[in-house]
């Protein structure tokens, strides 16, 4: 109205006609994160199952808030026993995202990630069977596909050959996943992690893990419990302070904790910050 005062009946009618401003969907509210401190070499470790769903297809999704910059820091790595082959995802000393798989990937973004007050969402979706080389590794940051990578002397400019078996997806009872460190010592993570997911056997769409809030335009998390995780898949929401490595995927792929305690459970998450 001209006076700026609306009568109750007018407001009701405007709501019915979808003309009254209302709060947009807020997305899934993440309760907890896990704090990794490089000073105490915090990490999570799990022996992989003997039979993975696939060594050619898989998807990693996680939210991360960095604490320290300009050092090599491993987010996740796979230790392949009795062999020097391995795969890992990291930030390098220049704060680029970097993925290395010794069966055929060396990719580093041109973008840098240096905002220690921000939560970043990374999705790394793999499928080596695809005909288009650059589709075999799809990287998304906050819902947007990243396509600008540093020049590489490796074949395919750092992208894998078709139909390779990714080391980072390889199972076996003597193989191990490490979150927060490389399979050997060093390059420890100094950051908060939330909603850490691995899907064994599928190159998932980024929209399986997040969505843009229709009112704010901000990328927010989605519920992932309805996804199919595969034999070695896992979902770590970090909601059990007494067992921060507990897997909630239904696959019982729990991680053992190394130097992490209940004090490392945090309420600083991608939903609150």
PLM feature spans:
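Short surface loop/edge beta-strand patches of beta-sandwich-type extracellular domains
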Residues: 38-58, 105-113, 181-185, 220-227
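Extracellular glycan-recognition modules
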Residues: 40-98, 130-133, 206-207
């Amino acid at each position: 109205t001209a006076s700026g005062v609306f009568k109750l009946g007018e407001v009701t009618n405007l709501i019915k006609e979808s003309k009254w401003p209302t709060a947009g969907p807020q997305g899934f509210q993440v309760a907890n994160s896990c704090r990794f401190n490089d000073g105490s070499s915090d990490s999570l470790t799990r022996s992989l199952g003997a039979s993975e769903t696939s060594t050619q297809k898989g998807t990693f999704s996680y939210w991360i808030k960095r604490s320290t910059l300009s050092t090599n820091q491993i987010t996740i790595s796979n230790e392949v026993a009795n062999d020097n082959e391995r795969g890992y995802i990291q930030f390098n000393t220049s704060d680029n995202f970097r993925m290395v798989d010794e069966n055929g990937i060396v990719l580093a973004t041109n973008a840098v990630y240096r905002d220690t007050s921000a939560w970043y969402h990374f999705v790394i979706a793999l499928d080596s069977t695809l005909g288009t080389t650059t589709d075999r590794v799809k990287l998304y940051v906050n819902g947007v596909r990243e396509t600008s990578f540093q020049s590489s002397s490796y074949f395919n400019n750092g992208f894998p050959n078709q139909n390779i078996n990714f080391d980072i997806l390889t199972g076996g009872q003597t193989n191990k996943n490490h979150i927060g460190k490389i399979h050997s010592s060093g390059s420890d993570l100094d950051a908060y992690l939330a909603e850490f997911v691995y899907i064994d056997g599928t190159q998932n769409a980024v929209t399986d893990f997040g969505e843009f809030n229709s009112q704010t335009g901000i990328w927010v998390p989605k519920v992932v419990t309805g996804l199919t995780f595969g034999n070695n898949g896992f979902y770590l929401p970090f909601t059990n302070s007494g067992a921060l490595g507990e897997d909630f995927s239904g696959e019982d792929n729990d991680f053992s904790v190394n130097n992490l305690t209940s004090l490392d459970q945090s309420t600083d998450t991608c939903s609150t910050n």
